[in-house]
Amino acid sequence: MTLVNEHFLKLPGSYLFSDIAKKVNTFKITHPKQDIIRLGIGDVTQPLPKACIEAMHKAVEELASKDTFRGYGPEQGYDFLIEAIIKNDFIPRGIHFSASEIFVSDGAKSDTGNIGDILRHDNSVGVTDPIYPVYIDSNVMCGRAGVLEEETGKWSNVTYMPCTSENNFIPEIPDKRIDIVYLCYPNNPTGTTLTKPELKKWVDYALANDTLILFDAAYEAYIQDENVPHSIYEIKGAKKCAIEFRSFSKTAGFTGVRCGYTVVPKELTAATLEGDRIPLNRLWNAASAPSSTVLLTLPNGLQKPFTVQKAKYRLKKQSTII
């Protein structure tokens, strides 16, 4: 008899963003003349830059020729993209990685969901509240979240760290040890950020408590303040306690293309029950996306188009949200 993973049965009957989409569609039907400002899924509204489209056409033509056809890509992603990521995203900020610490994938969402597969099911979990649903759902599906408390809508084995107007939407450092802490900055859904001193407190906490920080930096492209770090690795010691997730959805408008990457430093370890330290880098892998070739164009003359594109989003935001 084949048995199901009964933890899946604990999930609520519907997904938050699916519910939002249904309500939006219903509203559009009943109010056809209303202009809707969507504050749900962080989708893009501008087309892909011309250079990306040209690169896509070139990549397709390569697949059509016997001389240039590519099959399965390298398990960590193509070297040309990994080298470009290191050169453009990290070296300018004084951060240095080897190519084997960067894992190209089909997006930050899948990686933040799948990363739990290399961690024991009985690790304790901490999340900011409110939180991106994937962080919770992925822990529910592996049995790490515990039992859903109907009255509160919260899970028994998850520590929720409130982000409210009372604390300026900045969570307080926990007063107890937690095995895994999810941080997303700039934050989804509040839009808040952490300064370097504020993020340093979390790194210090993680180092002192042997805590793993899962840092979602999907929205780093929108940071404008010099005192707000684009990467957790701008903080000393973070390579020993943090995994960082990046997305090209906001940098390159790739929500419909799917490509991102995860950084797993070689210095980062976790323990076995016997107390042996195991490098997490060697446990992780990547799903090399076909969109990788397109991203080679990003560092080559595309800074201006992407700067203009981000400026359009900011102007749109300022003109429609009061």
Each model region followed by its residue ranges:
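N-terminal small-domain helix-loop-helix segment of the aminotransferase-like
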Residues: T2-D106, V308
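Helix C-cap/helix->beta junction micro-motif
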Residues: H31, A208-N209
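The start of beta-strands in P-loop NTPase/AAA+ ATPase cores
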Residues: D35, I95, D179, T211-L212
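Hydrophobic/aromatic beta-strand patches that form the interior of the parallel beta-sheet core
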Residues: I37-L39, G126, T159-M161, L214, ...
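Conserved core of the PLP fold type I
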Residues: E61-A206, E220-K236, I243
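Conserved core segment of the aminotransferase class I/II
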Residues: E151, E234-T320
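Residue-level marker for buried hydrophobic side chains located in beta-strands
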Residues: Y185, I213-L214
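Walker B catalytic acidic pair
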Residues: A217
